[in-house]
From Swiss-Prot:
EC number of the protein: 2.7.11.32, 2.7.4.27
Pfam families reported in the protein's UniProt record: Kinase-PPPase (PF03618)
Domain of life from the UniProt record: Bacteria
Species assigned in the record: Bacillus cereus (strain G9842)
Reaction(s) catalysed by this chain's protein: N(tele)-phospho-L-histidyl/L-threonyl-[pyruvate, phosphate dikinase] + ADP = N(tele)-phospho-L-histidyl/O-phospho-L-threonyl-[pyruvate, phosphate dikinase] + AMP + H(+); N(tele)-phospho-L-histidyl/O-phospho-L-threonyl-[pyruvate, phosphate dikinase] + phosphate + H(+) = N(tele)-phospho-L-histidyl/L-threonyl-[pyruvate, phosphate dikinase] + diphosphate
A GO term for molecular function: protein serine/threonine kinase activity
Positions of ADP binding: 148-155
Family per record: Belongs to the pyruvate, phosphate/water dikinase regulatory protein family. PDRP subfamily.
Disulfide bonds: none
UniProt-recorded name of the protein: Putative pyruvate, phosphate dikinase regulatory protein
Upper taxonomic lineage: Bacteria, Bacillati, Bacillota, Bacilli, Bacillales
Length: 270
């Protein structure tokens, strides 16, 4: 049975069927000749594959999610005396029977899920790499640029947008003593969002932060005059960029994220 031909037929890429066939064939001391037939959308293609399989005395293994296509292949293969094995159909039917839910019958769902997963990972890695202004080059590469003084939730918001919306987010901290990176004035203003906060709220947040670190809440970092100076600098920079400003004083991360997502969707940026 050396070089037994196996046709892997799928209405998508065929990776699932290919992996299952290789795993099964690995239990036998012969090397199969696996030939993938992807993106099958019509019975004409199935009929052709059956004919070729018959002439080569080959086996057909398939993952077709649509019931009519599955039934056609099984019926026609049996009529021609060709062995055909349905890899995914019986499991779909069993799950439907157990759960009472109707399948979507959409080809390529696994591949789309994989692509979404990798987009998420890429976005998360981007958020880490370009967090807190570490590398200004990320500003021009980002989908979203967050701008704000310290403790305005730039980092957790960046991570939330990466995890849940698969957006690549860079964030830039503003302090009066350091000039903003030039890239901040080069990026499209529609991608930029200034995170505004009231002095009193920021004063409270910073004092709590210092306490959690075991430091005195009387440090300059939490001084109300210093905070006002930082906010004035923030407003000056934002006025030059002319981007949207979101008051995060009393907003949860999720709420701010939704405002940003709605804004970019309305602008049809992605």
């Amino acid at each position: 049975m050396d070089n037994k031909i196996v046709y892997v037929v799928s209405d998508s890429v065929g990776e699932t069927a290919d992996l299952v066939v290789r795993a099964a064939m690995g239990q036998f001391p012969f090397a199969p000749d696996i030939r993938r037939v992807p993106y099958v959308e019509d019975t004409g293609t199935l009929k052709e594959v059956i004919s070729i399989a018959k002439s080569n005395q080959a086996l057909i293994c398939f993952t077709l999610v649509k019931p009519d296509m599955r039934q056609y292949l099984v019926t026609e293969a049996a009529r021609e005396g060709v062995e055909a094995y349905d890899i995914i159909g019986p499991l779909i039917d069993q799950i439907e029977e157990i759960t009472g839910q109707v399948p979507r019958y959409e080809p390529g769902v696994v591949r789309r899920l994989d692509e979404e997963y990798f987009k998420k990972i890429e976005a998360i890695e981007f958020a880490v790499k370009y967090d807190d202004g570490r590398d200004a080059r990320g500003i021009l590469k980002a989908d979203i640029v967050l701008i704000g003084v310290s403790r305005t939730s730039k980092t957790p918001l960046s991570q939330y947008l990466a995890h849940n919306k698969r957006l690549k987010v860079a964030n830039v901290p503003l302090v009066p003593e350091v000039d903003p990176p030039e890239e901040l004035y080069q990026v499209a203003k529609e991608k930029c969002f200034g995170l505004k906060i009231t002095p009193d709220k920021l004063n409270h947040i910073r004092k709590e932060r210092l306490k959690s670190l075991g430091l005195s809440d009387g440090a300059t970092y939490a001084n109300i005059n210093r905070i006002q100076e930082e906010i004035d600098h923030f407003e000056e920079v934002i006025s030059k960029i002319n981007c949207q400003v979101i008051d995060v004083s009393n907003k949860a991360i999720e709420e701010t994220a939704n405002i940003i997502v709605n804004a970019v969707q309305n602008q049809k940026m992605f």
